[in-house]
From Swiss-Prot:
The modification 4-hydroxyproline is found at residues 6, 14. Belongs to the conotoxin O1 superfamily. The presence of a 'disulfide through disulfide knot' structurally defines this protein as a knottin. The keyword Secreted applies. Delta-conotoxins bind to site 6 of voltage-gated sodium channels (Nav) and inhibit the inactivation process. This toxin acts on Nav1.2/SCN2A, Nav1.4/SCN4A, Nav1.5/SCN5A (weak activity), Nav1.6/SCN8A (EC(50)=2.5 uM). It comes from the Eukaryota. Coiled coil: none annotated. This is Delta-conotoxin-like CnVIC. It comes from Conus consors. It is found in: Secreted. PROSITE patterns: DELTA_CONOTOXIN. Negative results: does not show activity on rNav1.3/SCN3A, Nav1.7/SCN9A, rNav1.8/SCN10A, Kv1.1/KCNA1, Kv1.3/KCNA3, Kv1.4/KCNA4, Kv1.5/KCNA5, hKv11.1/KCNH2/ERG1, shaker and DmNav1/para. Found in the dissected venom (DV), but not in the injectable (milked) venom (IV). Expressed by the venom duct. Signal peptide: none annotated.
């Protein structure tokens, strides 16, 4: 399955972010 890159909207399908966490409906990268 494809995953969303950081900064992508994920409100509809949370938990599908690539190496990121869905916060405030957007994928937020865990590494800064």
């Amino acid at each position: 399955d494809e995953c969303f890159s950081p900064g992508t909207f994920c409100g509809i399908k949370p938990g599908l972010c690539c190496s990121a966490r869905c916060l405030s409906f957007f994928c937020i990268s865990l590494e800064f």
